[in-house]
A protein has these predicted regions:
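Transmembrane-helix exit segments and adjacent C-terminal regions of multi-pass membrane proteins
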Residues: 1-22, 255, 453-519
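C-terminal module of multi-pass small-molecule transporters
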Residues: 20, 71-73, 77-90, 103-110, ...
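Interfacial helix-cap and linker-helix signal at transmembrane-aqueous boundaries
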Residues: 43-44, 75-76, 160-169, 225, ...
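A membrane-interface helix-boundary motif in multi-pass transporters
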Residues: 166-177, 227-239, 307, 428-483
Length: 519
């Protein structure tokens, strides 16, 4: 049995006040995942870390955030959503402080893993709380702000990291400290402004076994994705062992979820057409969001020779596209009540943007690159958050948490896998390009002065040019692959059922049968 402690509907002003706190904490949570991308060389150097530890500083946060996302979502369906958001903020703040105080790479990795638990909670719960505050019909315009913040955080994180490490009086530790005061402010803002109904359910049972199996299965697969093609080959016993173990654990999780009263991921929701197709589309959008930020930054720094700060500034067209599309499309959805046309259009624009980026090399006009990045941004901004909205519109309020976190989970998973796979393709392509260019220049193999070294200043000028050209030319190839994968998102969006957004927080209750009495 369940009881709901009702609250008066929040006014537009009250929603904006609460939304300010939610967006603040979501911003710092997502920035924490991307800010280290340009700062890591200095961080690992200062802590005397290894290449393996370099990878794990990023992987640890991504791993715990992705694995914990569906668990946070299910908890939101069972317990006080406001309290869970506040707990996530506290976990994030503690993890950030510990990371900033780390004295060696091992301590930093452990702190980042703990921080990731808070990040996973905030990524899932912010969307759940918004769904509990605002009916789907009105949610579009507010989701526009949410999508814009997520995009700015993802693309702007590397820029902020570059500025911090390039500023002598700050230092790399502020990459972790910078979000702490903002998160604390958001905590107090939410305590004062967030007022949503509290669902109280009797005899609640958490599916700990299912949650553990999901976390373990996803963790094994993400660890494999992080190390494949670097520590071992794609076709190796390590690959078969890790992929096999991950799939077995996830298969067991499905078996458990199908038989428990309170599954972490309700399978009846996942089997719904809208949810299933949104999951597929979210995988492609996730790769666009994360892959674009990672590899475009590398393209500008290595392929074109710009500094970390300059590379961050050059990604502004993509940031502007995401932010503008998120806000404009959100308002159009609220006005029309239809969501499918905008998701389809967004995924098509995403394909066009990637197709344009597939033609770039180390000499391509920055105006052309900027225009292509803007298209990618518009595609992401038109589809990313609206896929969550489409799912939220088709499930009852009691399942909003699980449904929203499922989409967020697959978006993060798609981004993780996409970055790893595209990174492996890029590395192989760069190696081939460098080898052929050195041979064409008459430089014997093994005498290129360490051409694979990313510290280009340590290379002879002629070899520097070869390495830059190799990276610049290879980057277009991986975006061609991205365009092909984004086509899957177009197909998934096109197959979604057109559904008008409902104007109530919850689905209409089925009509109760009138008892018939006999005399």
């Amino acid at each position: 049995m369940s009881q709901t402690k009702t609250e008066e509907p929040m006014s537009h002003r009250q929603i904006l006040e609460a939304l300010s706190g939610l967006l603040l904490v979501l911003f710092v949570a997502m920035v924490s995942s991307t800010i280290v991308s340009t700062a890591l060389p200095k961080i690992i150097g200062a802590l005397n870390g290894t290449q393996s530890q370099y990878t794990w500083v990023v992987t640890a946060t991504l791993l715990t955030a992705t694995a914990s996302t569906p668990i946070w979502g299910k908890l939101a369906d069972l317990y006080n959503k406001k309290l869970l958001v506040q707990i996530s903020i506290v976990v994030f703040v503690v993890g950030s402080i510990l990371a900033g105080l780390a004295q060696n790479a091992g301590e930093l990795i452990a702190a980042r893993a703990f921080q990731g638990i808070g990040v996973g909670g905030l990524q899932a719960l912010v969307q759940v709380v918004i769904a509990a505050m605002i009916p789907p019909r009105e949610r579009g315009r507010y989701n526009g702000y949410l999508g814009g913040v997520m995009a700015v955080a993802t693309v702007g994180g590397p820029l902020l990291g570059g500025v911090i490490v390039d500023t002598s009086w700050l230092g790399w530790r502020w990459c972790f400290f910078v979000g702490v005061p903002i998160a604390v402010i958001a905590l107090f803002v939410l305590q004062k402004t967030l007022h949503i109904a509290t669902l109280r359910r009797d005899n609640v049972k958490i599916d700990y076994l299912g949650a553990s199996l999901i976390a373990a299965g996803v963790s094994v697969l993400l660890i494999w994705v992080s190390f494949v093609d670097g520590s071992f080959a794609w076709l190796s016993w390590q690959t078969f062992a890790m992929v096999g173990a991950g799939l077995v654990l996830l298969a067991l999780a499905v078996w458990v979820e199908a038989r428990t009263a309170e599954p972490v991921v309700p399978l009846d929701i996942v089997r719904q057409r809208t949810t299933a197709l949104s999951i597929i589309a979210s995988l492609s959008v996730g790769m666009a969001m994360f892959g674009g930020a990672v590899f475009l930054g590398q393209y500008f720094q290595i392929g074109r020779g710009y500094t970390p700060t300059e590379a961050g500034l050059l990604t502004i067209p993509m940031m502007a596209g995401v932010l503008g599309a998120s806000i404009v499309v959100g308002r159009l959805i609220t006005r029309s009540g239809n969501i499918k046309p905008y998701i389809v259009a967004g995924t098509v624009i995403l394909v066009l943007g990637f197709a344009a980026l597939a033609t770039i090399d180390h000499q391509t006009s920055l105006v052309y690159v900027g225009a292509a990045m803007f298209l990618v941004g518009v595609g992401v901004g038109s589809s990313m958050q609206n896929l969550v909205l489409a799912v939220q519109n088709t499930v009852p309020l009691k399942d909003i948490g699980a449904a929203s976190s499922t989409i967020a989970f697959f978006r993060s998973l798609g981004g993780t896998i996409g970055v790893s796979v595209l990174g492996a393709v890029l590395a192989r392509r760069v190696t081939d390009n460098i080898t052929h260019a050195l041979a064409a220049a008459g430089v014997p193999a093994g005498s290129g002065g360490g051409a694979s070294n990313l510290n280009l200043n340590a290379l002879p000028p002629a070899v520097q040019h070869i390495v830059r050209a190799a990276y610049g030319d290879a980057t277009g190839h991986i975006f061609l692959i991205s365009a092909g994968i984004a086509l899957v998102g177009v197909l998934a969006a096109a197959l979604m059922r057109p559904t008008a957004l409902r104007s109530t927080l919850d689905l209409a209750a089925p009509a109760e049968k009138v008892p018939v009495t006999t005399r």
